[in-house]
Amino acid sequence: VAAAPGYGSKLARSGFGAPSLPRWCVWVQPSAAGDADRWERRWLQGVNAALDSWAKLLPIVRVGDPRRAHVRVERRRPPLRQLSGGWRASNGRSLLQVMEVKRDDRSLLEPRVTVLVSPELRALALRATALHELGHAFGLWGHSDNPVDAMAPVQGASPVLEPSEDGHLTLEWIRRQPTGFGQPVPPEIRSDDT
């Protein structure tokens, strides 16, 4: 891991390896009513722009059914998080679950990520937040030390709207690492042996 490019050595891993897939199915929460209002349109534009940025670097398939998605992007403010010094608010959050799913009569291990992006942000901050949280969802479960990187925990004065070269290198590296995700579930952890 020490020879990892970019900030690959700082990424968290699961016991199954990096939560990465060859192709990601993504669902984005549609507007509540048929026609999106101004605020919903702004949110959708920011999230879609962030998805388009990542789609230049890895295969993404947008799906209309959230049950088919590996990544679900939801329009809501993340709940407060309790830290040692008190409570902390955030603009976005990515929540990873490890799922056993049936595909073509096979049990596979897949990541399911719920991405929360607050609708109450300025347009550029919303897009930058979506870009950052989607980076986590696609396997970058860590942060860059560079404040002008989309994966920095706190960005500089201007919102970062595209993945950096370090982010690109790190993503390519993580996608080449061995992983149990997308593979048959090992018999010792299967929930149903039938």
Language-model segment annotations:
Residues 1-39, 96-107, 180-184, 190-194:
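Disordered inhibitory propeptide/activation segment of secreted metzincin zinc metalloprotease zymogens
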Residues 19, 144-147:
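Short, compositionally biased low-complexity segments
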Residues 30-42, 114-125, 153-161:
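Second-shell loop/turn segments in exported
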Residues 150-182:
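Post-HExxH zinc-binding segment in Zn-dependent metallohydrolases
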